[in-house]
Design a protein with these regions (language model features):
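Short, conserved structural patches
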Residues: 1-8, 63-185
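Alpha-helical assembly-interface signal, strongest on the long, hydrophobic N-terminal helix that forms
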Residues: 1-93
Length: 185
């Protein structure tokens, strides 16, 4: 049976060795920092993807507005659904890969007699819900036309104190607008 002095010495030696041993401290430190690091990383990635999707929507809006401005959409007699499926989101396009074109892309095309008559209302109501009152009126030669496209982008990194949603249901409304005067086609 060891003496009490010997057991105290062995406890002291054990504590001394424990203080000197640094193995595993990196794992503990990483476990403390990792959740914050990954939350920040995912928030940055999600923000970048939202900006990229917004830029794609802007590009698609400009391209499809050009078809209206030159009269090609009017000559083809597109309906709103045909315009969306054949011009905005044709199969294999980046927009058709990135967006849910069937149910998620909203197109609003309105024509006016002059730029002073143009009125653009918000598509978000007081309860942060999307207002779907889209029209398709590409106008005729010389008309002022405003083309707006919307997409409700779902967000995933919202519960970590970083929330860029502007719609209910953790969604961000992406919007792109083009205003122009139709050419005399």
């Amino acid at each position: 049976m060891p003496s009490p002095a010997a057991s105290r010495a062995s406890v002291r030696n054990l504590l001394r060795r424990f203080r000197r041993n640094r193995r595993g401290s990196l794992a503990v430190e990483f476990a403390l920092v990792a959740p914050v690091f990954f939350a920040l990383l995912f928030a940055i990635i999600e923000t970048a993807i939202v900006f990229f999707a917004g830029q794609v929507l802007e590009s698609v809006t400009q391209t499809s507005a050009r078809l209206i401005m030159t009269g090609q959409a009017q000559n083809a007699a597109y309906t709103q659904a045909q315009f969306k499926s054949q011009v905005v989101c044709p199969a294999g396009s980046l927009a058709s890969i990135l967006f849910d074109c069937t149910n998620g892309v909203y197109i609003d095309v309105e024509s006016y007699p002059a730029f002073t008559n143009v009125t653009i209302n918000s598509q978000i109501d007081g309860s942060n819900n999307f207002i779907n009152n889209m029209q398709y009126n590409p106008g005729g030669p010389g008309d002022i036309v405003v083309v707006r496209m919307f997409y409700q982008w779902p967000l995933f990194v919202t519960g970590l104190g970083y929330n860029i949603s502007n719609l209910s249901g953790s969604k961000r409304l992406l919007a792109a607008t083009a205003a122009f005067k139709n050419e005399p086609y």
